UniProtKB/Swiss-Prot annotation:
HAMAP family in the record: G6P_isomerase
Pathway the protein takes part in: Carbohydrate degradation; glycolysis; D-glyceraldehyde 3-phosphate and glycerone phosphate from D-glucose: step 2/4
Name by which UniProt lists this protein: Glucose-6-phosphate isomerase, cytosolic 1
Alphabetical list of CDD domains matching this protein: SIS_PGI_1 (cd05015), SIS_PGI_2 (cd05016)
Enzyme Commission number: 5.3.1.9
Single GO cellular component term: cytosol
Organism listed in the record: Clarkia mildrediae
Entry annotation: catalytic residues: E360, H391, K516
Protein family per UniProt: Belongs to the GPI family.
Length: 568
């Protein structure tokens, strides 16, 4: 018999729906009292410890989720990804970000060709170039060393590398290697972002990395042209060849722009933007800042999880477990959001990156076969490091909406601080909150407990915590380059698991196209109105009104201005 077209039509899905009612009637206070249950919901791999015992689930729930995974052919879909099959069916592409961190002697094929040698050709080129920049053998147009780097890109070309950069900044080895150097990321087309990025930098000591696969991305190329003008106005047009390099596959446009094609670093159609941090997109700027050896450890960490994901049985497979639990929370328990709460300031850019990886991947309304989904899929992801988030949005998580939480802790701080006479050190203070918050969410506080504490009657409703709010805890031993790579890969594969089970294409992003095409029409109107005085036409009443107000308020903007760069 043919498999159902939608996962929700399978017996495994219906079985979980029937199972749901019993779970809803059981409070986490009761579930957490079952030591055997809790122990069965703890998994460890390579000193990464996952505790999902505070999920609204029992061992039977997990078994039923495994059956759902089987009904969705999860293992076969994972294998197809690793085998280079064109699982991105709407764009007819392989999905092979795992090849970006594979060892040199690996064989991972796309369209019958082993792509790993191509990957390592680029990695070797990055190592050579970054070494030359860092040791001063590659210098700028005026003979000065290039100590500062601005990486120009948007979306996946920005959020992933920024996450890794921020996480590495205070790692002892990485920070030592980065001494005297600066790495900045220019993403937004807003001129304020340009102004802030070039503020305090000297064009003579600055290298610009332009990241655009096609070299046609509107925002990125406008920012690249702006920085080209910043460099050439200070150093002359020939300086561009020494101060700008590219990550792109469009060599003719790279050369036309003024960048030496020998200084273009390739990546491939089988790398999606949000999965590209392990390609030249991230490896080049990160190697310029921290040295290739540090970045190679990051790649090795990601690869270790790639191996774990592809080979570990589901009951011990961290990304699979996380993905299945997300499906359970979203599609069955009806919780649309997820809070990513790292108790490490070094991970402050994790949530924004995973927000893109998750929401751009799984924010789909139809199946991979084009059928409308009759169930909720995708998650609204947000987060903030602890304990900052506790003084921000935790109020809602404790007493408002139920939002499943990922608590991420690190056993050993990158930068320990000890003060004589304090009850605990700074990291212990942080971790006290990491251990306390999941229990506060799970157990809550009852009116009876408050009465026993002699809380005033009129305050009891306000101080009651219902509890029964799910979370999971991930404990990392350290936060060095290797562990950062592992954490990245765990979340990447978790997102893939969700998409594989929901039966959607997690590797296209057609939702970003419509707004871009409409912006082209607006851009044409703004040009016509400023240069030729054309009236605003062809828009609905609301947009026409807004555009007219904008044009009237900016009537002093010259139609054909001379170049003006930020002055900050």
């Amino acid at each position: 018999m043919a498999s159902p077209a939608l996962i929700s039509e399978t017996e495994a899905w219906k079985d979980l729906k029937a199972h749901l009612e019993g779970i809803k009637r059981t409070h986490l206070r009761e579930l957490m009292g079952d030591t055997e249950r809790c122990q069965s919901m703890m998994v460890e791999f390579d000193n990464i410890f996952l505790d999902y015992s505070r999920q609204q689930a029992i061992p039977d729930t997990i078994k039923k989720l495994y059956k759902l995974a089987d009904a969705a052919h999860l293992k076969q879909k994972i294998d197809r990804m690793y085998n280079g099959d064109h699982i991105n069916s709407t764009e007819n592409r392989s999905v092979l970000h795992v090849a970006l961190r594979a060892p040199r002697d690996s064989a991972i094929c796309s369209d019958g060709k082993n792509v790993v040698p191509d990957v390592w050709n680029v990695l070797d080129k990055i190592k050579d170039f970054s070494d030359r920049v860092r040791n001063g053998s590659w210098i700028g147009a005026t003979g000065k060393e290039l100590k500062d780097v601005i990486a120009v890109g948007i979306g996946g070309s920005f959020l992933g590398p920024l996450f890794v950069h921020t996480a590495l900044q205070t790692d002892p080895e990485a920070s030592k290697n980065a001494r005297g150097r600066e790495l900045r990321f220019l993403a937004n087309v807003d001129p304020i972002d340009v102004a802030r990025n070039i503020s305090g930098l000297n064009p003579e000591t600055t290298l610009v990395v332009v990241v655009s696969k096609t070299f046609t991305t509107a925002e990125t190329m406008l920012n690249a042209r702006t920085l080209r003008e910043w460099i050439s106005s200070a150093l002359g047009p020939t300086a561009v060849a020494k101060h700008m390099v590219a990550v792109s596959t469009n060599i003719p446009l790279v050369e036309k722009f003024g960048i030496d094609p020998n200084n273009a670093f390739a990546f491939w159609d089988w790398v999606g933007g949000r999965y590209s941090v392990c390609s030249a997109v991230g490896v080049l700027p990160l190697s310029l800042q921290y040295g290739f050896a540090v970045v190679e450890k990051f790649l090795q960490g990601a690869h270790s999880i790639d191996q774990h994901f592809s080979s570990a049985p589901f009951e011990k497979n961290i990304p699979v477990l996380l993905g299945l639990l997300s499906v359970w929370n979203v599609s069955f328990l009806g919780y649309p959001a997820r809070a990513i709460l790292p108790y490490s300031q070094a991970l402050e850019k994790l949530a924004p990156h995973i927000q893109q990886v998750s929401m751009e991947s799984n924010g789909k309304g139809v199946s991979i076969d084009g059928l409308p989904l009759p169930f909720e899929s995708g998650e609204i992801d947000f987060g903030e490091p602890g304990t900052n988030g506790q003084h921000s949005f935790y109020q809602l998580i404790h007493q408002g909406r139920v939002i499943p939480c990922d608590f991420i802790g690190v056993v050993k701080s990158q930068q320990p601080v000890y003060l004589k006479g304090e009850v605990v050190n700074n990291h212990d203070e942080l971790m006290s909150n990491f251990f306390a918050q999941p229990d506060a969410l799970a157990y809550g506080k009852t009116p009876e407990q408050l009465k026993n504490e002699n809380v005033a009657e009129h305050l009891i409703p306000h101080k009651t915590f219902t509890g029964n709010r799910p979370s999971l805890s991930i404990l990392l031993p350290t936060l060095d380059a290797y562990r950062i790579g592992q954490l990245l890969a765990i979340y990447e594969h978790r997102v893939a698991v969700q998409g594989f089970v929901w039966g959607i294409n997690s590797f296209d992003q057609w939702g970003v196209e419509l707004g871009k095409s409409l912006a082209t029409q607006v851009r044409k109107q703004l040009h016509g109105s400023r240069v030729k005085g054309e009236p605003v036409e062809g828009f609905n009443f609301s947009t026409k009104t807004l555009l007219t107000k904008y044009l009237e308020a900016t009537s002093d903007v010259p139609a054909d201005p001379s170049t003006l760069l930020p002055n900050i």
